[in-house]
């Protein structure tokens, strides 16, 4: 999805592409991406060959944190070679100092950055820029923030990612989802809550969670199949940063199968949005919708995925300019998208 955007960008030069699917190895990258032309770059699974190209950065769209060992092994090889990494894979790394990040996830990256004098930046959409860059930028327009909430309000009807075991969508309500366990939920999604607290100069009292399910009274169809009546077709969870006994920072998700699911739960002014609600002086309310308007027919989920990939790509020059080590959204300057207007 990102490669076609790289090849036409005036700032970036694609020098190599690594793949994990054996069926893609040895094929021209243009063919792999379904482009009308070849690129003269062969997809490879040879990491040493990619490192030998001496790129300015690896933009890494690897698997999720469920594959931590694989991700860490690959990323550290590039960092030790002095190659900066901008990744969307290990989302707990959006805030590396979060207390739930295990040392064996953090220490190898720290050591590799020191050895190679390289930097490692992790981003995403949520957790990521929709609940770190967006709310913190808007907080900078206030004299006082009483509460700040960043919400993902998405219809998962066309989403094909994993959510049954993780969220409980599509399953009987009595089956406990992985994310109903508070520490797992905070670990997977909550890194931006302590990040915002740090940026605001406060120390949270504690982080709490809520998790609710909505059971569909009728059968529903999605891209992944049929959800029978009586099963979960929407979930709502919150991760809450408490300060002075009150929830001051909140991350919220409402994910549903069908716009009419869980009608009493929050929705956007249009479907599929990321929203920031700040109660303060002044209060600010912002909704962001990612869409394709090029007639391609690609949906909002695909637009959000592309934006996520491009956040990592566009961060490369700024990350190159930083001192070695971990990089978070708080370390980056404004990234206005040089070369995007052409």
Where are these regions (language model features)?
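Rossmann-fold NAD(P)-binding glycine/threonine-rich loop
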Residues: 69-76, 80-81, 89-118
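Conserved active-site and cofactor/substrate-binding residues in soluble primary-metabolism enzymes
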Residues: 1, 45, 53, 73, ...
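Alpha-helical support elements that line or immediately flank enzyme active sites
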Residues: 129-141
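Active-site-lining helix/loop region of Rossmann-like oxidoreductase modules
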Residues: 139-264, 272-274, 302
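N-terminal glycine-/serine-/threonine-rich beta1-alpha1-beta2 phosphate-ribose binding loop
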Residues: 1-81, 201, 304
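C-terminal active-site/capping subdomain that shapes the small-molecule cofactor and substrate pocket
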Residues: 222-342
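Short, ordered loop/turn segments at secondary-structure junctions
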Residues: 20-22, 63, 83, 90-93, ...
């Amino acid at each position: 999805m990102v490669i076609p955007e790289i090849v036409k960008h005036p700032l970036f030069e694609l020098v190599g592409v690594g793949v994990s699917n054996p069926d893609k190895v040895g094929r021209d990258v243009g063919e792999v991406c379904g482009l009308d032309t070849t690129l003269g770059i062969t997809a490879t699974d040879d990491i040493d060959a990619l490192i030998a190209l001496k790129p300015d950065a690896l933009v890494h769209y690897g698997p999720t944190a469920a594959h931590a060992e694989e991700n860490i092994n690959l990323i550290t090889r590039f960092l030790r070679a002095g190659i900066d990494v901008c990744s969307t894979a290990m989302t707990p790394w959006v805030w590396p100092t979060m207390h739930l990040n295990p040392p064996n996830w953090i220490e190898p990256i720290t050591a590799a950055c020191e050895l190679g004098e390289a930097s490692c930046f992790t981003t995403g959409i949520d957790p990521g820029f929709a609940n770190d860059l967006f709310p913190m930028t808007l907080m900078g327009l206030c004299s006082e923030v009483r509460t700040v909430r960043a919400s993902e309000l998405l219809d998962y009807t066309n989403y094909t990612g994993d959510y049954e075991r993780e969220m409980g969508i599509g399953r009987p309500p009595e089956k406990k989802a992985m994310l109903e366990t508070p520490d797992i939920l905070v670990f997977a999604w909550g890194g931006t809550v302590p990040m915002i607290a740090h940026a605001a100069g406060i120390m949270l009292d504690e982080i709490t969670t809520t998790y609710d399910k909505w059971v569909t009274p009728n059968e529903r169809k999605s891209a992944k199949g049929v959800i029978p009546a009586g099963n979960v077709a929407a979930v709502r969870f919150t991760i809450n940063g408490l300060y002075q006994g009150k929830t001051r920072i909140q991350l919220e998700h409402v994910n549903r199968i069908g716009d009419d699911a869980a009608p009493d739960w929050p929705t956007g002014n249009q479907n599929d949005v990321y929203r920031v609600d700040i109660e303060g002086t002044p209060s600010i309310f912002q909704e962001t919708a990612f869409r394709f308007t090029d007639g391609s027919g690609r949906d909002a989920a695909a637009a959000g995925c592309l934006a996520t990939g491009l956040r990592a790509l566009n961060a490369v020059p700024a990350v190159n300019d930083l001192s070695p080590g971990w990089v978070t959204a708080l370390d980056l300057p404004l990234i206005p998208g040089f070369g995007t207007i052409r």
